[in-house]
Design a protein with these regions (language model features):
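Conserved beta-strand hairpin/beta-sheet module of binuclear metal-dependent hydrolase folds
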Residues: 2-48, 148-165
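Short hydrophobic/aromatic-enriched beta-strand-loop microsegments
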Residues: 79-86, 103-105, 158-160
């Protein structure tokens, strides 16, 4: 099921996780659910009136089973570059494996057993890169290569799992699902300082905020 939360911004509800469709310079898929969410992604795009083949790029906030899971299943109809950052991009390419010495790395290794790697072009992202109207901000902690994307033009922030939503407020990624909670807190503070104003906060878990997203991020940052 897809819901338009702002002009040109659609939430693709995959049950326990969100993906998004953003009409930027090209139709842009943001994250891709779990390996079991192919039907939800396809159905959500159909609800929004977009063919899978029309997707011009994929923006990944990070590598996790519930954010990259359908990419392999969506090809070859999906034929678009996938933008990902650093270590997470290396995981998606199959060049690296998550470290066993970190509890989150172990979770990722287990998730990798049921997650196929996509045969798609993986484009490395760097902090400050402009991708369409979005700017990439490296926000490590939940994963080493977690990245948020903010479009000043659209007033939209794609926050992935840096934060989640609960009762209309943003909450930082917790220890159980993060590599480094100290880095999470630093990333929240940094993004709150660096990002331009935005209304819409698209989160991986919970409900997206349709207004006041930047204010909610600053409120959270002030507590960390």
């Amino acid at each position: 099921m897809a819901t338009e939360i702002a002009d040109g911004v659609w939430r693709l509800d995959c049950g326990g996780v969100n993906a998004y469709l953003v009409f930027d310079d090209v139709p842009t898929l943001v994250d891709a659910g779990t390996p079991w969410d192919e039907g939800a992604i396809r159905g959500g795009l159909s609800d929004a009136g977009v063919d899978l083949s029309a997707i011009g790029r994929v923006l990944l906030t990070h590598y996790d089973l519930d954010h990259v899971g359908t990419l392999a299943a969506l090809t070859p109809e999906l034929d678009a570059p996938v933008h990902a950052y650093g270590f997470d991009a290396q995981l998606l390419r199959g060049y690296r494996t998550p470290p066993l010495g970190n509890h989150k790395g172990l979770i990722q290794r287990l998730g990798g057993l049921v997650t196929d790697l996509p045969e798609l072009e993986i484009v490395g992202v760097r902090d400050g890169d402009a991708i369409g109207s979005f700017t990439a901000y490296h926000t490590p902690g939940h994963t080493p290569g977690h990245v948020a994307y903010v479009s000043e033009e659209l007033g939209v922030a794609l926050l992935g799992d840096l934060v989640s939503e609960s009762d209309g407020e943003l909450t930082e990624s917790g220890w159980v699902i993060s590599y480094d909670t100290g880095a999470v807190a630093a990333s929240v503070r940094s993004l709150a300082e660096r990002a331009p104003a935005f209304d819409v906060a698209c989160v991986g878990h919970g409900d997206p905020l349709a207004s006041g997203g930047d204010e909610a991020l600053r409120r959270l940052a002030a507590t960390l």
